[in-house]
């Protein structure tokens, strides 16, 4: 499982 990067826009 992968979490989205904290830099991705909402």
From Swiss-Prot:
The lineage of its organism: Eukaryota, Metazoa, Chordata, Craniata, Vertebrata. GO terms for biological process: regulation of blood pressure. Belongs to the bradykinin-potentiating peptide family. This peptide evokes transient hypotension (-11 mmHg) similar to that evoked by 0.5 ug of bradykinin, when injected alone into rats. It has a high bradykinin-potentiating effect (101%), when 60 nmol of BPP-10f are coinjected with 0.5 ug of bradykinin into rats. It inhibits angiotensin converting enzyme (ACE) activity with a K(i)app of 2.32 uM. It comes from Bothrops fonsecai. Signal peptide: none annotated. GO terms for cellular component: extracellular region. This is Bradykinin-potentiating peptide 10f. Keywords: Hypotensive agent, Metalloenzyme inhibitor, Metalloprotease inhibitor, Protease inhibitor, Pyrrolidone carboxylic acid, Secreted, Toxin. The modification Pyrrolidone carboxylic acid is found at residue 1. It is found in: Secreted.
